[in-house]
C-alpha cells in the first residue's frame, strides 16, 4: 500500500472510462459488481486497455461486455492519474454523445446503473477518483458573454456565472483570474471554482491547480499549442476562447481533441 509521503512508483495501468450521455443530457453511472475492488461504488463504466487495443477499442469492448451497448464514436475529455490501494491507474475519460451509441442497457455483470444530471448526482458512494470529475462535469459546455465582463452558462442546478476577479464579490462562486495576475498575487482566490486564463503555452505548466483553464487564442501559434496540449491529455476542463478567424479554422479540431468548450470572442484585457 502506498502512503501519502512516498511517491507511487508502481507501473501505470491504462484504463479508459466513458462519459455516456442520453438525449436529455444526463450522464450514465454504474455500480462496481461484486468481486471487484470497491464493489458497490459508483463510477463511469470502462476498464483496462488490453495489449494491442486502442483506447477507443477498449471502450467499445468494455461497454458491450458490461452494459450491452455499442459505441460508434467518442472524443477524449480528461486524463487523470490516481493511486488506489490495489493499483496505480492512468484514467482516460472519453465523451460519448447521445447519438454516438446504440442498444438497450443491460446489467450483464449484475451491476446497477443510473442516469444522473451534472451538478446534481444522487447516487453514492462514488469511486474516489471521480470526485474532481463530477465537479468538472458541472461546468457548462456553452457560454454567452466575454471573459473581461463575465460568462453565463447553465447546468442541471441552474445558472452558472463566471465573474472576473476584479469584479468578483463574496457571493460569486466561480471566479476568472488571469495567470499573470494570479502569479503576482501568489495565491488562488477564495471561490467554489477558480478559472485561470492563459494566452501562451509557456503559462500552461503554471495553471495545473486551476479548476478550469480558459485559453485565449489570438494567433496560429497559440491555436496549435492548444492542439498539442490536448493531444497530451488534460486533467481539468480546457475552455478555448478564440478570435473569430481562429475559431472558424480550429473549433472542430479542438473539440475533437478534448476541449470542454470553444467560445468565439476577441482579445480582452487581464481580469
Locate predicted features:
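Conserved N-terminal beta-strand and adjoining loop/helix that marks the start
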Residues: 2-27, 48, 79
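Conserved hydrophobic/aromatic beta-strand scaffold that supports enzyme active sites
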Residues: 19, 29, 91-95, 115
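Conserved Nudix-box catalytic region and its N-terminal flanking loop in Nudix hydrolases
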Residues: 26-65, 78, 195
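A short coil-to-beta-strand element that immediately follows conserved catalytic motifs
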Residues: 70-79
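Active-site-adjacent beta-strand/loop module that shapes the phosphate/pyrophosphate-binding cleft
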Residues: 80-104, 119, 130
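Nudix hydrolase/Nudix homology domain
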Residues: 103-162, 264, 269-271
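Short loop-to-alpha-helix "cap/lid" segments that border enzyme active sites
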Residues: 152-156, 169-260, 265-271
Amino acid at each position: 500500500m502506498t502512503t501519502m509521503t512516498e511517491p507511487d512508483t508502481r507501473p501505470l495501468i491504462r484504463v479508459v472510462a466513458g462519459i455516456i450521455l442520453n438525449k436529455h443530457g444526463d450522464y450514465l453511472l454504474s455500480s462496481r459488481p461484486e468481486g471487484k475492488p470497491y464493489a458497490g461504488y459508483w463510477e463511469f463504466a470502462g476498464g483496462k486497455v488490453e495489449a494491442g487495443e486502442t483506447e477507443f477499442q477498449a471502450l467499445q469492448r468494455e461497454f458491450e461486455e458490461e452494459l450491452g451497448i455499442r459505441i460508434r464514436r467518442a472524443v477524449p475529455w480528461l486524463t487523470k492519474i490516481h493511486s488506489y490501494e490495489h493499483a496505480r491507474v492512468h484514467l482516460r475519460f472519453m465523451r460519448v454523445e447521445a447519438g454516438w451509441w446504440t442498444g438497450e442497457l443491460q446489467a450483464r455483470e449484475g451491476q446497477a446503473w443510473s442516469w444522473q444530471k451534472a451538478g446534481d448526482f444522487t447516487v453514492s458512494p462514488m469511486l474516489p477518483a471521480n470526485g474532481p470529475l463530477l465537479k468538472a462535469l458541472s461546468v457548462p459546455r456553452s457560454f454567452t458573454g466575454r471573459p473581461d465582463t463575465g460568462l453565463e452558462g447553465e447546468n442541471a442546478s441552474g445558472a452558472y456565472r463566471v465573474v472576473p476577479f476584479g469584479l468578483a464579490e463574496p457571493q460569486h462562486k466561480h471566479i476568472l483570474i488571469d495567470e499573470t495576475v494570479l502569479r503576482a498575487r501568489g495565491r488562488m482566490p477564495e471561490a467554489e471554482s477558480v478559472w485561470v486564463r492563459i494566452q501562451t503555452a509557456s503559462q500552461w505548466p503554471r495553471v495545473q491547480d486551476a479548476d478550469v483553464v480558459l485559453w485565449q487564442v489570438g494567433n496560429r501559434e497559440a491555436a496549435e499549442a492548444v492542439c498539442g496540449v490536448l493531444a497530451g491529455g488534460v486533467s481539468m476542463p480546457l475552455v478555448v476562447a478564440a478570435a473569430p478567424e481562429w475559431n472558424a479554422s480550429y473549433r472542430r479540431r479542438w473539440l475533437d481533441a478534448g476541449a470542454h468548450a470553444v467560445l468565439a470572442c476577441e482579445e480582452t484585457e487581464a481580469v
